[in-house]
UniProtKB/Swiss-Prot annotation:
Enzyme class: transferase
E.C. numbers: 2.5.1.72
GO cellular component: cytosol
Statement: the UniProt record of this protein carries the keyword Phosphoprotein: no
Protein name (Swiss-Prot/TrEMBL): Quinolinate synthase
Protein task: Catalyzes the condensation of iminoaspartate with dihydroxyacetone phosphate to form quinolinate.
Binding-site positions, iminosuccinate: H37, S54, Y125, I126, N127, S142, H211, P212, E213, T228
UniProt-annotated binding residues for [4Fe-4S] cluster: C99, C185, C278
Species, as recorded: Trichodesmium erythraeum (strain IMS101)
InterPro entries assigned to the protein according to its UniProt record, in alphabetical order: NadA, NadA_sf, Quinolinate_synth_type2
Pathway terms, separated by semicolons: Cofactor biosynthesis; NAD(+) biosynthesis; quinolinate from iminoaspartate: step 1/1
Positions of transmembrane segments: none
GO molecular function list: 4 iron, 4 sulfur cluster binding; metal ion binding; quinolinate synthetase A activity
Keywords: 4Fe-4S, Cytoplasm, Iron, Iron-sulfur, Metal-binding, Pyridine nucleotide biosynthesis, Transferase
Length: 323
């Protein structure tokens, strides 16, 4: 049930001097749209047609009239675009751009977990494989997870997968008792509570803003919790001038562009490393994006049976997001 992809040896192609111009030319030639997640490197964000979180990117993928979708993100995002657009060419610059959270929920094991709770419906966070989506009743994102769970009858048992931290946050916000799959994101679990508290002492006027994939002991220090889009909006609307940002630091590029006079401090990891950067998101770069468009590969392909099954819960999410 896993999505399959095709590769090409990208070493055979020369790289033009002006990648921005070359990519712009290919966009016109292919009638392509470039969708990029906030966690991508700044150059990719700057050349993208749309930058957003998982919900916004899903909505754009569903709406686009482009013939080619170039997805600057990780593979579950590109899979979602393909699920919504079976007749379009969907490209992912680097097929190794996976997701630790999606990998934490193997389909075979999740199938057994689901079978152990036959009366429960499955609400799956969009950060999962096409195979898990196909086993789900409703998909959600960090933007709409609380809203979606609130719309489910209170007497209906719910399995929430794969992110246990987002699941705990949804439980807290809704008062619902969810059956949680124990998955997590390596980036959002690497932030150091001790170092963030120390940062707050050093920057007493700064507000701590955090993504709900962070662990509960960190979220309790946050002045605001939200999806990447919600964090971005909050920084724009807040009167405060300094923020400690507890999510992947790629979002700070957009924060600085929209609020250049404000100061944004990346939340530190437990170790002295760049572990607060997603290693999968950072596999993409302009060169790979150009080569993907030039060669029309790597292409995302999903077995039709899996795609059709995965489409239903995604459509349900999109419907509930507008109610």
């Amino acid at each position: 049930m896993f999505a399959t992809q095709t590769r090409i040896n990208q070493n055979f192609n020369s790289i033009p001097d002006d990648l921005f111009e070359a990519i712009a030319d290919l966009k016109k030639e292919l009638n392509a749209v470039i969708l990029a997640h906030y966690y991508q490197e700044p150059d990719i964000q700057d050349i993208a047609d749309y930058i957003g979180d998982s919900l916004g990117l899903s909505q754009k993928a569903a709406e686009t009239d482009a013939d080619v979708i170039v997805f600057a993100g990780v593979h579950f995002m590109a899979e979602t675009a393909k699920i919504l657009n079976p007749n379009k060419l969907v490209l992912l610059p680097d097929l190794d751009a996976g997701c630790s959270l999606a990998d934490s929920c193997p389909p075979e094991e999740f199938g057994k977990f689901k079978a152990a709770h036959p009366d429960a419906i499955v609400v799956s966070y969009i950060n999962c494989t096409a195979a898990i989506k196909a086993m789900s009743d409703i998909i959600c994102t960090s933007s709409n997870s609380v809203k979606i769970v609130k719309q489910i009858p209170t007497d209906q048992p719910i399995i929430f997968a794969p992110d246990k931290n987002l699941g705990r946050y949804v439980m807290e916000q809704t008062g619902r008792d969810l059956i949680l799959w124990s998955g997590s994101c390596i980036v959002h679990e690497t932030f150091s509570e001790k170092k963030i508290v120390q940062l707050k002492i050093e920057h007493p006027e700064a507000e701590i803003i955090a993504h709900p994939e962070c662990e509960p002991n960190l979220l309790r220090h946050a002045n605001y919790i939200g999806s990447t889009t919600a964090l971005l909006k909050y920084c724009q609307e807040s009167q405060e001038q300094e923020f400690i940002v507890a999510t992947e630091p790629g979002i700070i590029h957009q924060m600085q562009k929209r609020e250049p006079k404000k100061n944004f401090i990346p939340a530190p990891a437990m170790n002295n490393c760049a572990c607060n950067e997603c290693p999968h998101m950072r596999l993409n770069n302009l060169e790979k994006l150009y080569l993907a468009m030039k060669n029309k590969t790597p292409e995302i392909m999903i077995p039709e049976e899996t795609r059709v099954a995965a489409l239903k819960p995604i459509q349900k999410m999109l419907e509930l997001s507008f109610t």
